[in-house]
Amino acid sequence: MLYLFYYCLLSPPYYFFTSHIQDFDYENKDQEELSFVSQGNRLSGTLLTPQHKTPSAVIVVIHGDGPQDRYSNGGYNPLFNTFLDANIAIFSWDKAGIGDSQGNWLHQSMEARAEEAVAALKLMQLRYPEVQVGFLGFSQAGWVIPIAASQSQPAFSVIIGGAVNWREQGQYYQKLRYEQQGKTPDEIIQLLAKEQKENDDIFGLHGTKDRTRRNDMSEDRFNFVVKNYLSDSSSYLRKMNGRILAVWGNNDLNVNAQLNACRYRAILNTHHQADIVVFPHASHGLLRVPEFNYQLESDWPIYRQLQFLWAGRKAYTEGSLPLIIDWIKNKNPDFSPYNMDCNL
C-alpha cells in the first residue's frame, strides 16, 4: 500500500512505533475472493475471516454514496480489522462499475442496491448456515438496508449515520455547507428555499426531469438523483426483519443526528429488538471529533489523513466500536448513556 510507505518515510520514529499502522493490513487474516450476480452484473468482493476460526457473526457491508471499492480506498481497513479481531467476518464488494465489478452504481435506485444486498446476504447465509449473518452500512446505506432487511431474513442490521428522508438530508447537508462558507442565517434561509423549489421542480414527483437545468451534474449523476430524490425509509423501517441497531455521531455534518434518531425511535417504537444510539463527540462515520469531522473525503487536509493513518482504529470515537461488536454478539450492551431525549 503506497500511502503506508510514504507515511513511514515521512514519520519520525516515535510516531511510527506508537502508531496503529498495522490496522491497515490484513496480516494473519484469511482473504477469499468471491463474486455473485445481481441484475445481470457480476460483482466482485472479498470475504475476510479470522484465521483458523469459525466466525461468531458475518457482516455484509453496504457502502454509502460514491464510487467505493470493497475497502473504501483503504478507509475501511481499521474498522474491518477491529471486527475481525473480535471474530466477526466481513464480506464487502466493489460497487457496480468500480474495481472488478460490472455495471454502473450511478444507474442504481435504492431498490436496486437493496436487491444486490439481499443477494450478498443469501450468499453468506448459504456459506455459514449456523452463524448469524447481517447487514452493516453507513450513510446512504440507511435507505438500502431497510429495503433489503424487509425482503430477506438478516439476523441483524446496523445502520450508521442514516437519514430517513433523502430530500431533507440534502437540505441539512447544504445548510451546514453554507455555514462553513460564512453565510448569514438570513442568506442561508433564502438560498435553501430557492434550492428546494428548484430541485422539487426538477426531481420531484411531478418534476420536469430536465437535465439542462442542472448542468453542474453529469448525465449519470443527474439520472441517479432522478431515481432516488424521493427516497424515504419510513415504510421499510417498519417492515425490517431481525435485530436493528441505528447509530449516529452527535456531531454529524452530513445528517441531522438528533432529528433522525428521534424519527427512528418513533417509527420503531413497537419493534422490541431495535436500539437507537447517538454517540457524543462522533462524526458521520463515528470518527473522533474534532480531528476527523469533515463532510467530504476531499475536505480532509493532508495532515489529518496522516493522523488517521497513525490512529488506525483509535480514530473512532471511544467506546463506539466495542459496543457495536457486543451488540452484534448478543451481549446486550448498556446503551442508556447514549439514548436521545426526544421530548425536548
Regions found by a protein language model. Name each.
Residues 19-52:
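N-terminal cap/lid segment of alpha/beta-hydrolase-fold proteins
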Residues 55-64:
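Short beta-strand element of the alpha/beta-hydrolase
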Residues 69-79, 95, 258:
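The serine-hydrolase catalytic nucleophile loop
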Residues 80-100:
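Conserved alpha/beta-hydrolase
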Residues 107-127:
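Alpha/beta-hydrolase active-site loop
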Residues 160-239:
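Accessory cap/linker subdomain of secreted extracellular hydrolases
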Residues 240, 246-248:
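Short beta-strand/loop motif that positions the catalytic acidic residue
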Residues 242, 253-267, 291:
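Short alpha-helix in the alpha/beta-hydrolase fold that links the catalytic acid
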